[in-house]
């Protein structure tokens, strides 16, 4: 599919319509007392829309990317104006303060962490102060990856937000030019968890998944292994040329798009494609 200006306008318009919409919003918050029962924007000065924190983060990534690719669209001007107002140091400081709360060490791990790094990387490609404002938040999540990966004994393979291969793909892309030690740590973790995987049975899809566990793992190993990937892949999915396992080549059935979890399967079909 070729991304046209019309597609870009429709995507960006839809996302802009909910980035600042505070309700409904699903908080990831441990209440320490009645004083914590505050509106979402009080806890998250930037990422308080789009139903939840990580959706707001990757919504920002989407509109910035579209604005860079199609800078002359009217909606791109709207995006830049919104970013000028929201991606500022004082609001980033509020997001950082939330990370310092008790019980926040696992907040948005690993999906939101990775998407924040992707957002920062995209912001760096714009002639604007947004990346500099976001940098302290990106560095905070990079440090969380540094602390977390060495103690993560087993990989999370589910096709939902907890999928570690997907998170490492985004984090590695950010780290390669900004934190080589983190990139090295990611490569070592990927090899430790996945290098010996053979004859994947692809027990997917799960009922509410939006990622292919098998294909996301393969994508990560492609960037980690480089020229050694072909041999690994031939052992990991030895019958892929025969479209086996068949489940990987069969679109998922989405029985009820009004169900927010089941509707994830639309995302699975898109991410597989």
Give the ranges of each region predicted by the language model:
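Low-complexity, Ser/Thr/Pro/Gly-enriched N-terminal "stalk/linker" regions
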Residues: 1-48
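Solvent-exposed loop and edge beta-strand segments that line ligand/cofactor-binding
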Residues: 3-5, 40-57, 97-114, 151-164, ...
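Long, well-ordered core segments of solenoidal/helical folds
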Residues: 11-24, 78-97, 103, 135-153, ...
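Alpha-helical solenoid scaffolds in large eukaryotic transport, assembly, and signaling factors
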Residues: 18-35, 53-55, 61-84
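Extended ligand-binding groove/face enriched in aromatic
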Residues: 57, 66-174
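Amphipathic alpha-helical elements of HEAT/ARM-like alpha-solenoid repeat scaffolds that form extended
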Residues: 60-63, 116-120, 167-172, 211-222, ...
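Loop-centered beta-sheet repeat module
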Residues: 144-217
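Accessory, usually C-terminal, subdomains that scaffold auxiliary metal cofactors
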Residues: 209-212, 220, 226-248, 259-268, ...
């Amino acid at each position: 599919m070729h991304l046209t200006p019309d597609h870009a306008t429709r995507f960006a318009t839809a996302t802009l319509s909910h980035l600042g919409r505070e309700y409904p919003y699903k908080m990831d918050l441990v209440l320490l007392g009645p004083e914590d029962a505050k509106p979402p924007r009080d806890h998250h000065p930037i990422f308080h829309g789009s139903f939840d924190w990580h959706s707001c983060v990757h919504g920002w990534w989407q509109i910035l990317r579209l604005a860079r690719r199609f800078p002359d669209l009217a909606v791109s001007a709207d995006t830049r104006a919104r970013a000028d107002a929201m991606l500022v140091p004082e609001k980033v400081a509020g997001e950082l303060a939330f990370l310092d709360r008790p019980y926040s060490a696992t907040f948005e791990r690993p999906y939101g962490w990775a998407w924040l790094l992707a957002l920062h990387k995209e912001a760096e490609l714009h002639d604007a102060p947004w990346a500099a404002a976001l940098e302290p938040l990106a560095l905070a999540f990079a440090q969380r990856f540094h602390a977390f990966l060495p103690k993560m004994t087993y990989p999370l393979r589910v096709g939902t937000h907890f999928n570690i291969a997907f998170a490492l793909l985004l984090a590695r892309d950010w780290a390669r030019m900004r934190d080589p030690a983190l990139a090295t740590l990611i490569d070592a973790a990927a090899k430790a968890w996945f290098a010996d995987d053979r004859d994947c049975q692809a027990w997917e899809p799960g009922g509410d998944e939006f990622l292919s566990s098998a294909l996301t793992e393969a994508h990560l190993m492609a960037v980690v292994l480089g020229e050694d990937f072909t041999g690994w892949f031939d052992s990991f999915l030895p019958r892929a040329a025969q479209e086996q396992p068949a489940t990987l080549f069969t679109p998922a059935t989405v029985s009820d798009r009004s169900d927010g979890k089941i509707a994830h399967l639309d995302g699975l079909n898109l991410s597989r494609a």
